[in-house]
Amino acid sequence: AYVFLAAAKVGGILANNQYRAEFLYDNLMIEANVIHASFLTGVEKLLFLGSSCIYPKHAPQPLKEESLLTGLLEETNEPYAIAKIAGIKLCEAYRSQYGCNFISAMPTNLYGPNDNYDLQGSHVLPALIRKFHEAKKRGISEVVMWGSGTPLREFMHVDDLADASLFLMQHYNEAGFINVGSGDEISILELAQMIKKIVGYEGAITHDSSKPNGTPRKLMDNTRLTQLGWKSTITL
């Protein structure tokens, strides 16, 4: 049996900040239970999927795997990041102590069908799609964005991650985790303008500077994965 451990409690800045205990506890329990059960039942291989938020807030960009645990985390999603780092370390520990073929991959920001569009808990891309769609439908004159719009983010279609996950199951057996990204970045404001144009919204974009920006830049270094022979194919 092969286990793809993609289950997690996830959300944007608002949810991460508001439910800090839940984000830490729920994610620790999910990964600990599944990883331990996989060991007990003797699964052939397990892939644990983490997140790019594991990296320190001021880590050099693009983010390389060796930057893990070299500095302080972004405060807004620290509980989630700590849980994901624990998942990586669990896989490494079970490999070291029991010889389990448990591997870890850290995907960048994902988007795609069946995303979470709840404004209280969604990530930035689905949140913006919903905001612009509803503003157009209701004739609202402006869409308010959190922060300045200057942070840079990388996005990957979920189908690309599925493809990369299968590739890693077949070709990757190392103890250390590996980045999975698209290699392309865009500012949040540019993303908003793109969505505004696609939706056909004619109103204005305004900024709520009282709300946090999050990490200034988050781009993955995909060198290791590219060298193995995989790269993303779906552009934003």
Residue spans of the language-model regions?
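Conserved catalytic-core motifs of eukaryotic protein kinase domains, centered on the activation segment
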Residues: I13-A21, K57-P62, N114-Y117
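Glycine-rich "substrate-gating" loop/helix at the edge of Rossmann-like oxidoreductase active sites
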Residues: T76-Y80, T108-H123, G147-D159, S182-D184
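Conserved Rossmann-fold NAD(P)-dependent oxidoreductase catalytic core, especially the SDR/UDP-sugar
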Residues: L5, A32-N77, I103
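Active-site helix of classical SDR
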Residues: L69, P79, A83-A86
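C-terminal substrate-binding subdomain of Rossmann-fold SDR/epimerase-dehydratase oxidoreductases
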Residues: E134-L236
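NAD(P)H-binding glycine-rich loop region in Rossmannoid oxidoreductase-like domains
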Residues: A1-N27, L40
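Conserved catalytic Lys-bearing alpha helix of Rossmann-like short-chain dehydrogenase/reductases
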Residues: L28-V34, V43, A83-C91, L125
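Conserved beta-loop-beta element that borders a ligand/cofactor-binding pocket
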Residues: G50-S51, I88-N116, P126-I129, K137-V144
